[in-house]
Amino acid sequence: MDYNSKTSTGGRNMAGARALWRATGMTDGDFGKPIIAIANSFTQFVPGHVHLKDLGQMVAREIEKAGGVAKEFNTIAVDDGIAMGHSGMLYSLPSRDLIADSVEYMVNAHCADALVCISNCDKITPGMLMAALRLNIPVVFISGGPMEAGKILASTVGKSHNNEDSSGGAIRKLDLVDAMMDAADDSISDEDVAAIEASACPTCGSCSGMFTANSMNCLTEALGLALPGNGSLLATHSLRRELFLEAGRTIVSLAKRRYEQDDDSVLPRSIATKAAFENAMTLDIAMGGSTNTILHLLAAANEAEVDFKMHDIDRLSRGVPCLAKVAPASQKYHMEDVHRAGGVFALLAELDRAGLLNTDLPTIHSATMKEAIDKWDIMNPDNLEARARYIAAPGGVRTTEAFSQSKEWSNLDVNRESGCIRSAQHAYSEDGGLAVLYGNIAERGCVVKTAGVDDSILVFTGRARIFESQDDAVAAVLDDQIVAGDVVIIRFEGPKGGPGMQEMLYPTTYLKSKGLGKECALLTDGRFSGGTSGLSIGHASPEAAEGGAIGLVQEGDTIHIDIPNRTINMQVSDEELAARREEMDSRGRDAWKPVSRDRHVSPALRAYAAMTTSADTGAVRDVSQVER
């Protein structure tokens, strides 16, 4: 079959277009080669992207060596950590759709044949994934890689707010969340807070724990759309250079197979099937990934026209054990430790041994996932290439440069009984790291990262404390108005109600800093940062702005949460709920809106709110809401 690009490069009538292509550097010999789009997300605003500036051209040169033509463009990238806790967070989730659209626009406008996605942080990988599945042309995902964990002498500053002693005897490992928690703890001096702040984020790369960015970059491996090591190999390590070069070679091979051999098995929709989405979700549950991944996998499946819904996630969550507890669930381990233990393919191998994966699926780099697992499982001592890749260690030097160090661990972590990654027989818990809860407060579901919930509060009953903005909830926590036994409810913060479905990292972090991390719960129709832990339940659907029952909860109502049985209910009769709904509906134009909230919402955000949907659908866009 013809290359897509022939539309703009072939025939007499395209002389004008070819003239413009020539002005970009193309020559006679380039017409007829596959044109590969490189979607780079370099920006100096985001540590996960600050090192990407020259990497697109590195991939481009490799594409050209392999017989393709490379054309790079950029997308935006929002740093959720910098946007957190103020009106900037309203823009984070909407940026996902903007990124997806921008990739679609550039690829389709210029008739590109294939796509390399250079992503990294929270909404960029999901946005590019949505675009890739929408476009359905050959694609390779290559992320910028994780940040090294921060490290500081444990005896000198701060204290651990985690579920276990994380000092390791001498060194306390840090990340962004530690800086936030300790800053809110009045018992820690300004000097100590400054020292922690200066140490928490030492290098370029996506934040160092199993937060949203790293979770999503791991899931692209499980979907079969990224190379082994993509989710865990540090941004600073020289071995990551080879992943970028391999991405360039791989995409040309995929493009030629698609167009010259008419092989549709290389297309993203042929790879990211329902079985592949189930594999990705199984991995997500086993590694205790961010709850945001649920939102993004649902949205990606929607773009792929795959029937993958919340009930599938609920079903999977009941049968997958927790095989990894990584920050924020445990400060003992960060992504550098996951990599040392074999990364994503170590987890996939353990899940395969437990009979929990479908491995008869293609990937961009192997005929089947089974073949890939057999090659990249470090538990096989004969897998020398895998063992060499996963020995990559942190450099321990502050830097914003990619590939700037080549340190190695003295040994791999192959301890599947008590190491970072466990076998199913030695799982952290039989119940996985994510769960979907249902009940009269969230009829279409809500989600919780169970890997971060202490066993003592898996079943919790408390009184509702109602807030209609994140800011008001934060103020109440910091003013000591929240006490043990409270269920903090933050509503009208969903995709429509916010708009933009803000992350609630500050409220949960401040609860922990006040010593209430095991004494309170938080429920919202908004969402949580991947850095959140504790009894933090988000994505309540339908959201309050769409008539969800979370909008009917009243101050002092009793809320019962039962994670083992997957339920969440307000202990209010059906009759009382019906009466409350009738009263709410009677408010006319003021119904299902915050009673009093002063928030500027720009036209761009109003447009997003007009078309978005609740979290149980992935907060995807539904243009029928505005079509006439």
UniProtKB/Swiss-Prot annotation:
- Specify the superkingdom: Bacteria
Q: What keywords sit in the KW lines?
A: 2Fe-2S, Amino-acid biosynthesis, Branched-chain amino acid biosynthesis, Iron, Iron-sulfur, Lyase, Magnesium, Metal-binding
List of residues binding [2Fe-2S] cluster: 121, 207
Residues given in the record as Mg(2+) binding sites: 80, 122-123, 503
| UniProt record, GO biological process | isoleucine biosynthetic process; L-valine biosynthetic process
Active site residues of this protein: 529
* Pathway in which this enzyme or protein is active: Amino-acid biosynthesis; L-isoleucine biosynthesis; L-isoleucine from 2-oxobutanoate: step 3/4; Amino-acid biosynthesis; L-valine biosynthesis; L-valine from pyruvate: step 3/4
GO-annotated cellular components:
cytosol
Q: EC no.?
A: 4.2.1.9
PANTHER family per UniProt: D-XYLONATE DEHYDRATASE, D-XYLONATE DEHYDRATASE YAGF-RELATED
Describe the subunit structure: Homodimer.
**Family, similarity comment:** Belongs to the IlvD/Edd family.
Protein name in UniProt: Dihydroxy-acid dehydratase
Q: Where is the organism placed in the taxonomic lineage, from the top?
A: Bacteria, Pseudomonadati, Pseudomonadota, Gammaproteobacteria, Moraxellales
